[in-house]
Design a protein with these regions (language model features):
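Accessory terminal helices/loops
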Residues: 1-39
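Glycine-rich His-Gly loop
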Residues: 61, 96, 151
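Intrinsic disorder/low-complexity detector
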Residues: 6-10, 56-57, 73, 99
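Conserved beta-strand hairpin/beta-sheet module of binuclear metal-dependent hydrolase folds
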Residues: 32-86
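Short acidic/polar alpha-helix capping motifs at helix-coil junctions
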Residues: 19-22, 41-48, 67-70, 97-101, ...
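Core dinuclear metal-dependent hydrolase active-site scaffold
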Residues: 36, 46-47, 57-58, 134-155
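Active-site HxH/HxHxD metal-binding segment of metal-dependent hydrolases
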Residues: 53, 67, 74-145
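A composition/secondary-structure signal for short, hydrophobic, low-basic-content segments
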Residues: 5, 12, 91-96, 148
């Protein structure tokens, strides 16, 4: 998933993109959360959870404050705290392996919608929405385009 951004602004892969000043972009008050990357339009926050040290990311629109959690891996208490701190609207699962989905029941119970590809949906204990290749999702004023890359899992 790649957010659409202003073509005149640096992208996450450009040499001009990088960590923002923490003075301009305060971190959420959640232990273990780091501001991984940002520019004028978006922030990416990262937390590492579980025994397998899974990376969980939150993409946040800087203009609206709305966010999406990427992979409800495990340690649901930490993830729910992060969701509340960063105004998460929904959860996107990158794939259905057990170490990326353990917190799905807890985040759904807390009211967050969970989306996954149809080919991996059966691997999740539950979900709300199916993602197709080239689905466009809005997170505030950002647009995410899904790209299905089967191989690691079916979807």
């Amino acid at each position: 998933m790649i957010p659409d951004m202003d073509p005149d602004q640096p992208t996450p892969t450009s040499p001009h993109a990088g960590p923002c000043s923490h003075h301009d972009h305060p971190r959420p008050a959640v232990p273990g959360v780091a501001l991984h990357w940002c520019d004028e339009q978006a922030e990416i926050h990262r937390i590492v959870v579980g025994d397998f040290e899974n990376n969980v990311f939150v993409l946040r629109c800087r203009q609206t404050g709305q966010s999406v959690l990427i992979d409800a891996a495990n340690e649901h208490d930490k993830l729910l705290e992060l969701c509340r701190a960063l105004d998460v609207q929904s959860v996107l699962e990158t794939h259905g392996h057990w170490d990326h989905i353990q917190a799905v029941p807890a985040v759904r119970e807390a009211g967050y919608r969970v989306a996954v590809t149809a080919d991996d949906a059966a691997m999740l204990p539950s979900y709300d929405d199916l993602l197709e290749d080239e689905t466009v999702l809005e997170v505030g004023r950002l647009r995410l385009h899904t790209i299905c890359t089967p191989g690691h899992t079916p979807g």
